[in-house]
C-alpha cells in the first residue's frame, strides 16, 4: 500500500513538468507515450453551474471563457448552464436542467457562484439548527435512550448558507456518483452598469453589513460540511482587481472591474487545469497497479 501511494505521489509531483506546453504534452491518444501522464480530466464531460463569469452570453465573443480554454487544452466537453446575475438559489434549477439534458453522461460538475449573493446583500446565516432529542446509544453498557443535542442543516433561501445547503443537497441527490467541485468567488472591484446598477468594490460592506470575505469563507466551510472538494479561486488565481496594475485581467478599468476579460479567463483556466490534476473527474478505475512491475497507468 505504501509503495502504491509513493508511486501516485511521485507521478503527481512530475505533472507540472510533463504539462509544460499543453498542446504537445497532454496526450489524447489511447495510450500515452512513455514518460507522459494523461490529465485525469482529459476528454471528460463537465457541467458548469454559475453566474455571469461562466455565462457564454456575458459579453459574447468579446470574452473567451475559462471553460472554452479547458475545452481547447483538455478536450473537455462543456455543458454550460451559468446565467448572468444568478445566485446560489438558482443552483437547483441549473442542476435540474443539466440532469434533464445530459443525465448520466456528465462526468463532473463545477460550481462557481456567490458573488451576486454578496452584492444582493443576502444574509450569510448559519448552517444548522440545534435541538435536543433522544437517541439510542451504548458505551460498554446496555443500550438506552439518551438526550443529546442534534444539529440539522437549515434549508432556506432566505440566507446564503441555507441556499448552499439546498443547492449541495440537490446536487448530491441528483448526481450521487459524480465529482462535484466548488470554486470560491473571485475578488471584486467597481462595476458601474448604469444609474440603477452600481456595485462598489470589495472594501465596502454590503447592505447587511458583511464583507465579501464571509461569502468566500462559507464556500470553504461547505466543502467540509457536504464532502465536496473546494478550489479557492479567490486565492489561487492570483487576480485582484483592487490592484490597479492587475486590471489587465478585467474587462474595463472604467466601468467593469468585476468581470475577467479573456486574459483573466485564461489565467483562471490555467489555474483550474493544474488544480484539477489532484482530483479525479470520475470514479471509475483511474489507477491500475501491476504488482509484479509496480508501474502505474493513469
Predicted regions and their residues:
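Glycine/Thr-rich phosphate-binding loops of Rossmann-like dinucleotide-binding domains
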Residues: 56-57, 87, 119-120, 190-191, ...
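Glutamine-centric residue-chemistry signal
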Residues: 5, 22, 94-95, 265, ...
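Hydrophobic h-region of N-terminal signal peptides that target proteins for export
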Residues: 12-20
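Short, glycine/acidic-enriched loop or turn micro-motifs at the edges of active sites
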Residues: 54, 235, 294
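Alpha-helical cap/lid subdomain in secreted, periplasmic
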Residues: 73, 94-284
Amino acid at each position: 500500500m505504501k509503495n502504491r501511494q509513493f508511486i501516485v505521489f511521485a507521478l503527481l509531483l512530475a505533472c507540472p513538468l510533463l504539462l509544460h506546453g499543453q498542446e504537445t504534452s497532454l496526450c489524447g491518444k489511447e495510450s500515452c507515450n512513455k514518460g507522459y501522464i494523461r490529465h485525469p480530466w482529459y476528454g471528460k464531460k463537465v457541467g458548469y453551474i454559475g453566474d455571469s463569469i461562466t455565462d457564454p452570453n456575458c459579453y459574447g465573443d468579446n470574452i473567451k471563457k475559462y471553460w472554452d480554454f479547458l475545452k481547447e487544452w483538455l478536450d473537455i466537453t462543456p455543458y454550460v448552464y451559468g446565467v448572468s446575475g444568478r445566485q446560489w438559489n438558482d443552483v437547483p434549477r441549473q442542476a435540474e436542467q443539466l440532469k434533464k439534458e445530459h443525465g448520466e453522461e456528465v462526468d463532473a460538475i463545477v460550481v462557481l457562484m456567490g458573488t451576486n449573493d454578496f452584492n444582493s446583500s443576502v444574509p450569510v446565516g448559519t448552517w444548522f439548527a440545534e435541538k435536543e432529542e433522544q437517541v439510542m446509544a451504548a458505551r460498554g453498557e446496555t443500550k438506552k435512550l439518551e438526550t443529546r443535542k442534534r444539529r440539522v442543516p437549515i434549508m432556506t433561501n432566505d440566507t446564503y448558507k441555507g441556499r448552499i445547503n439546498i443547492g449541495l443537497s440537490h446536487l448530491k441527490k441528483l448526481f450521487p456518483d459524480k465529482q462535484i467541485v466548488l470554486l470560491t468567488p473571485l475578488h471584486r472591484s467597481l462595476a458601474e452598469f448604469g444609474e440603477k446598477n452600481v456595485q462598489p468594490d470589495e472594501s465596502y460592506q454590503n447592505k447587511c453589513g458583511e464583507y465579501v470575505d464571509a461569502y468566500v469563507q462559507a464556500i470553504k466551510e461547505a466543502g467540509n460540511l457536504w464532502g465536496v472538494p473546494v478550489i479557492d479561486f479567490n486565492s489561487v488565481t492570483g487576480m485582484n482587481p483592487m490592484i490597479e496594475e492587475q486590471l489587465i485581467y478585467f474587462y474595463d478599468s472604467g466601468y467593469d472591474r468585476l468581470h475577467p476579460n479573456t486574459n483573466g479567463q485564461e489565467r483562471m483556466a490555467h489555474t483550474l487545469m493544474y488544480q484539477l490534476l489532484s482530483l479525479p473527474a470520475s470514479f471509475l478505475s483511474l489507477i491500475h497497479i501491476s504488482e509484479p512491475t509496480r508501474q502505474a497507468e493513469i
